[in-house]
Regions:
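Two-component/phosphorelay signaling modules centered on CheY-like receiver
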Residues: 11-29
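Alpha4 helix (beta4-alpha4-beta5 surface) of REC/receiver domains from two-component response regulators
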Residues: 62, 82-99, 107-110
Length: 121
């Protein structure tokens, strides 16, 4: 079982993640902006964070950088539109994956399985 944080200003996306991943036996929390995500990561040790790029209050890239300052948690980026150069940039910063919306649930589940089965440093 993995502890997963889903960060997206669209509540429906967070609810879909919760339904699907809880069905698979994972614990799923939601945050609706970057600031809330940072606070949650400070308070709880997650195995994986799915982070939207475009959100109010704090853009995903800034939230990503702040999360990486306080935690070693793997972060997967998701967005409705990610240009190839932006995707390379995000991966170079240390994201474990970039997902385009609508999400491919098989790929999401595959990443969760990979993270769960990877020994922590």
């Amino acid at each position: 079982m993995a502890k997963i944080l889903v960060v997206d200003d669209e509540r429906m996306i967070c609810e879909e993640f919760q339904d699907i991943l809880q069905e698979d036996g994972h614990e799923v929390d939601s945050a609706f902006n970057g600031l809330e995500a940072i606070e949650k990561v400070k308070l709880k040790e997650y195995d994986l964070v799915f982070l939207d790029v475009l959100m109010p209050r704090m853009e995903g890239r800034e939230a990503f950088e702040k999360i990486k300052e306080v935690s070693k948690v793997p972060v997967a980026i998701m967005s409705g539109y990610i240009p190839a150069n932006k995707e390379r940039e995000i991966l170079a910063l240390g994201a474990v994956a970039c997902f385009k919306k609508p999400l491919d649930l098989a790929k999401v589940r595959s990443l969760v399985t990979q993270v769960v089965n990877t020994p922590k440093p």
